[in-house]
Amino acid sequence: MKHLLLAAAAVLALATVPALASEATFERTLSVSGRVELSVSTGSGNIHITRGAGNQVHIWGKVKQSGFGKILIPAPSDERIRAIAANPPIEQTGNIVRIGGHHENLHNISIDYEIQAPEDAFLDAASGSGDVTVDGVGENAKISTGSGNIHATGLHGGFKLDTGSGNIYAEQAGQGDVKAQTGSGNVELRNLHGGLHGGTGSGNIKVAGTPSTDWKLETGSGNIDFTAGGAAFTLDASTGSGGIHTDMEMLTQGSTDHHHVSGKINGGGPTVRIETGSGDIRVH
């Protein structure tokens, strides 16, 4: 009976552990005088970046507990959360702005960021497990997250997107080579003009654009949809157990069957190689 009472007391004690420490916010505005080099990172928080004035970087942040549901990890104190909000991890050296990164007091704490920056800023944004959203900012952008989603529009020039298991959606403004990779999510890319390497372990891929150099699209078990418009390119498509469908006129090359098609479309051009292990391929 005594052991049962002790066990019940232990369960009650665990149940009454607060789920959240308090939250605290901060706001900063940094003045810049030229092309900004912007680096943003957070352990498990979200990052949201939008286009702002050309001469400043405006930062709003929310500091909060991370590691929810992990009873053995003590919650950070309200005092520590407030201390980080009072002195957030922001560094500026001229037009180089670094937000997040290493901070000795960030154990069990995450920070969500909402940032306004000049549209032509060089951008490097990374989250350990949160979502990253970018709207109208980023020259030669590099965006990554461990397990969150990436949603980026208005990216200038080439860009590189990488997530461990989330979905990727991106729209390009201008021309440049693109690389987009996810371990198990879906990939959707629009308005591409340049080279492309897009891949996912088991999700679907949907792409619209005009190849100016070779493209490669690959998934382990999903479907792939490519909208080419009036682009001229050479198609090399293969699937392990799905079908290949196109409504475009094509001058075939070599042998073709239900699982492999190769040929020139609109006279040929850069090679678009499309591969899936077990999904369908559509080109239109």
Protein language model annotation of sequence segments:
Residues 7-16:
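Bacterial N-terminal signal peptides
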Residues 1-7:
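Positively charged n-region of N-terminal signal peptides that target proteins for export
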Residues 195, 204:
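A contiguous binding-surface segment within folded domains or other stable secondary-structure elements
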Residues 214-216, 223:
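Acidic, glycine-rich calcium-binding repeat modules characteristic of RTX/beta-roll
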Residues 19-127, 133-145, 151-163, 169-181, ...:
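Acidic (Asp/Glu) and glycine-rich low-complexity loops/linkers
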Residues 132, 205-207, 224-227, 283:
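Beta-strand-rich extracellular passenger or scaffold domains
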Residues 185, 203:
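Pocket-lining segment of extracytoplasmic ligand-binding domains
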